[in-house]
Amino acid sequence: MATGGTVRPAEEPEEEEEEEDEAVEEEEEEDYTFLPLVHDIIKCMDKDSQDVYQELNELKSKFQAMRKLVGNMPGIDMSPEEQQRHLQSLREQVQTKSELLQKYKSLCMFEIPKE
């Protein structure tokens, strides 16, 4: 199957995906950190710079974005006790489904075709 392009080993795409995932994670971590902004504000204050107001506005908008993000999280409207009950219910469902899956596997109703 010649496509005119170079053939890469099968491992390369996975490595590229891992690198992309790490880059996205780093980007997301930066979105949730406030320390660099606070540091910039302190530096501006030390220099008596007029950029302090801009930095403060950036910090304020970041806090607002985080409040919105937290407000939209699933389960935020439930108490910790309700969350624990819900978690326990989900664990029981997983346990039941795992047991059923093992039961169905042991029935040997599914034949694996021989090639």
From Swiss-Prot:
Highest classification ranks of the organism: Eukaryota, Metazoa, Chordata, Craniata, Vertebrata
Role, per record: Component of the Mediator complex, a coactivator involved in the regulated transcription of nearly all RNA polymerase II-dependent genes. Mediator functions as a bridge to convey information from gene-specific regulatory proteins to the basal RNA polymerase II transcription machinery. Mediator is recruited to promoters by direct interactions with regulatory proteins and serves as a scaffold for the assembly of a functional preinitiation complex with RNA polymerase II and the general transcription factors.
Organism: Xenopus laevis (African clawed frog)
Composition skew (Acidic residues), residue ranges: 12-31
Compartments reported by the entry: Nucleus
GO molecular function, one term: transcription coregulator activity
Region entry Disordered, spans: 1-31
CDD domains, A to Z: Med9-C (cd21431)
Subunit structure: Component of the Mediator complex.
InterPro entries per record: Med7/Med21-like, Med9, MED9_metazoa
Record's keyword terms, sorted: Activator, Coiled coil, Nucleus, Transcription, Transcription regulation
Any single GO CC term annotated in Swiss-Prot or TrEMBL for this entry: mediator complex
Family indicated by similarity: Belongs to the Mediator complex subunit 9 family.
Name of protein: Mediator of RNA polymerase II transcription subunit 9
UniProt gene name: med9
Primary localization: nucleus
Coiled coil: 31-107
Entry-linked Pfam families: Med9
Signal peptide range: none
